[in-house]
Design a protein with these regions (language model features):
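Per-ARNT-Sim (PAS) sensory domains and their PAS-associated C-terminal
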Residues: 16, 21-31, 46
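Conserved mixed alpha/beta catalytic, RNA-binding, or beta-rich assembly cores of soluble enzyme
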Residues: 8-12
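Generic secondary-structure transition motif, activating predominantly at the C-termini of alpha-helices
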Residues: 13-16, 66
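Sensory coupling linkers of modular signal transduction proteins
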Residues: 41-67
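A short, hydrophobic, proline-anchored segment that marks a local hinge/packing element in signaling
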Residues: 33-39
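Short, small-residue-biased leader/transition segments that mark boundaries at the very start
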Residues: 2-6
Length: 67
């Protein structure tokens, strides 16, 4: 939830966390959302990058592998 977002940003700012992966099901598809701290050359936190990847290919691969 929103509390998790604020906690993650505080940890990014403090330098205690650099990346958070979040797996979710979106409209029946497996998605991986990665939140990554963006830092300047001095290591100062300047923002968060959100990367969303459709991981459905992985489910399809493993389902075929077990046939």
């Amino acid at each position: 939830g929103l509390g998790d977002v604020y906690k993650r940003q505080e940890e990014f700012r403090a330098g205690t966390l650099d990346e958070v992966p979040v797996w979710m099901n979106k409209n029946g598809r497996i998605m991986l959302v990665k939140y990554m701290a963006v830092r300047d050359r001095n290591g100062q936190y300047i923002g968060t990058l959100e990367l969303v990847q459709d991981m459905e290919f992985a489910r399809e691969y493993f389902e075929r592998k077990h046939d």
